[in-house]
């Protein structure tokens, strides 16, 4: 008969596998017994971190707490994380939102803030004082003179594409690049450029063609002067 609780060593360290076919009470009983049996070989070092794989189910916070308590009190292990093959409705909704491309054809004027959960395509200009916030990438088919914040919730892999003019500012996650120096003040027309965070953790401004190389998953964006 297949055990409902198994402890295995993996390439990522120690993992405890809990069957998604068993009830929580069955798992608690078998886990307690398995850990009690292993106490015959005491370990005196620091507590070892362990991952708990729970299969095609979700535990409530209370159930996670109960499993954590059993492991903490009956072994020299501590849980680093619970891993499930499924996601909650809230997680699924957020994933769907972040995977969408939102688009608008308008002008973002001073004082306006447009915020979207996924990628954003604007056909129009961003005036000084206007701002776009996106959890994903931002593509602007127009002049950028305001603030563009891609990867708003911390996605450092996000990119921005558009015509950057004085006094625009590009933000990607927590990085900032400004076009507010005197060098940019007299520039009234420019080509489309891309902005991204390089391996050194700095925002780089480069040709639009670089998007395909640095972010190959973005392959359908095309733009021209």
Swiss-Prot record:
Protein name, UniProt field: Probable septum site-determining protein MinC
Binding partners and assembly: Interacts with MinD and FtsZ.
Any one biological process term the GO annotation gives: regulation of cell septum assembly
Domain of life, per lineage: Bacteria
Gene3D superfamilies associated with the record: 2.160.20.70, 3.30.160.540
NCBIfam families tied to this protein: PRK00513.1-3
Keyword Transferase: no
HAMAP family per record: MinC
Function: Cell division inhibitor that blocks the formation of polar Z ring septums. Rapidly oscillates between the poles of the cell to destabilize FtsZ filaments that have formed before they mature into polar Z rings. Prevents FtsZ polymerization.
Keyword field: Cell cycle, Cell division, Septation
Family annotation (SUPFAM superfamilies): Cell-division inhibitor MinC, C-terminal domain
Family according to the record: Belongs to the MinC family.
Species of the source: Listeria monocytogenes serotype 4b (strain CLIP80459)
């Amino acid at each position: 008969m297949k055990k409902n609780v198994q402890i295995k060593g993996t390439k990522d360290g120690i993992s405890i596998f809990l069957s998604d076919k068993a009830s929580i009470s069955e798992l608690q009983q078998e886990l307690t017994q398995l850990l009690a049996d292993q106490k015959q070989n005491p370990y005196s070092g620091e507590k070892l971190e362990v991952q708990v794989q729970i299969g095609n189910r979700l535990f409530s916070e209370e159930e996670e707490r109960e499993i954590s308590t059993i492991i903490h009190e009956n072994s020299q292990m501590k849980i680093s994380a619970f891993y499930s093959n499924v996601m909650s409705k809230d997680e699924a909704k957020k994933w769907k939102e972040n995977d969408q491309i939102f688009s608008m054809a308008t002008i973002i004027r001073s004082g306006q803030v447009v915020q979207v959960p996924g990628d954003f395509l604007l056909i129009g200009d961003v005036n000084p004082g206007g701002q776009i916030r996106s959890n994903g990438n931002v593509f602007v088919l127009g002049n950028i003179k305001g603030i563009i914040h891609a990867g708003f919730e911390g996605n450092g892999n996000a990119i921005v594409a558009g015509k950057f003019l004085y006094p625009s500012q590009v933000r990607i996650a927590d990085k900032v690049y400004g076009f507010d120096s005197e060098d940019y003040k007299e520039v009234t027309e420019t080509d489309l450029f891309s902005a991204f965070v390089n391996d050194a953790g700095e925002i780089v401004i480069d040709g639009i063609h670089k998007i395909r190389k640095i972010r190959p998953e973005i392959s359908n964006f095309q733009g021209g002067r």
